[in-house]
Amino acid sequence: MQDREQKLKLLNKTIETLWHGVKDSKEGDYPKIINLYKEVLKLDAKNNDAWENMIWLMWSMAINKKDTSWLFEAEKFAKRYLALNPNGYRAYEYIGQFYRVMYPDLKLATRYYESAIRWKDAPVSTHHSLIAVCENSGDKLRAIDYCKLTLARFPKDPYTVNKLKFLTSKEGN
């Protein structure tokens, strides 16, 4: 009988082969890969890459097949990902991205990005995403506030310096 590590290694190798190692990817490969990721997560629920790749594949299936059931499935697993991995910025950031890009809801995206930046290890790119979501949702004042907050943590960040200048200029009005 295989131990946990051997099973994970075999599952990941199979996923890699199906996803990247097959020249002519078959249409049915994504559902197979999704099921393999589910098996990986049964063995390793803290595997951020497996969660994020599986959710991305579900979103891709929703787009490619024009089948919203995949999108609802992706949302269900995105919420489960966060519930099982609440410590650290990464899951919050990913769910923010999910609601920003995959299942557009800027209010929810803002909420999750706000949670992500509370973590000290959140990279500057997470702050950039929050600023962009605020700006895109028409909340210029909030975007300005988050620029200032970002500059307090990352004082020389060129994106944020320029974004703040733009938002407070006549052009940004």
Q: How would you describe each model-predicted region?
A:
Residues 7, 11-14, 48-49, 89-90, ...:
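Helix-start (N-cap) detector for alpha-helical repeat units in TPR-like alpha-solenoids
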Residues 9, 13, 20, 32-36, ...:
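Extracytoplasmic/secreted proteins, especially bacterial periplasmic and envelope-associated proteins
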Residues 39-40, 80-81, 115-116, 149-153:
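Canonical positions in the second alpha-helix
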Residues 49-129:
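Alpha-helical adaptor scaffolds
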